């Protein structure tokens, strides 16, 4: 993530960042000297190992998805979702600590509304696009909407915040379908 064109919302498999460098530039071989093929890597990837990958007729070695040990079907199976949530939490946490025992945060409807706006600020910042050298990079998440934050008072002196963070969809598999149309449009 030292590249300004990459954000925490990007998958490690992002090809636009460039190919791997160093020891990962060569396709691995097993002890018998056979080059590692994608079928082995796909099996390791399904078992949640981090593996390199390449694309036919496309130069370079790249990294496969950043797998984590979430349950099957869970929202945190890709590292980019974990990083987005962690970044949001790192930005919200100091705001929450600053409100401890602060009477500006109380159980009145006006205070709850004001503090929903206050705690949504980091999410609004993460949703903004940025333009670098004429290229626009989307925000890391969708802009927050009404209802994306809930304030709950389980006791008189304790508050719980629930916040929804929605990352943008991003393709990890692209299928191209081409159809040949031989109609005679000149007739």
Could you tell me what each predicted segment is?
Residues 1-17:
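Extracellular Cys-Trp
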Residues 12-15, 19, 23-187:
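Structured, hydrophobic secondary-structure cores that serve as assembly/anchoring elements
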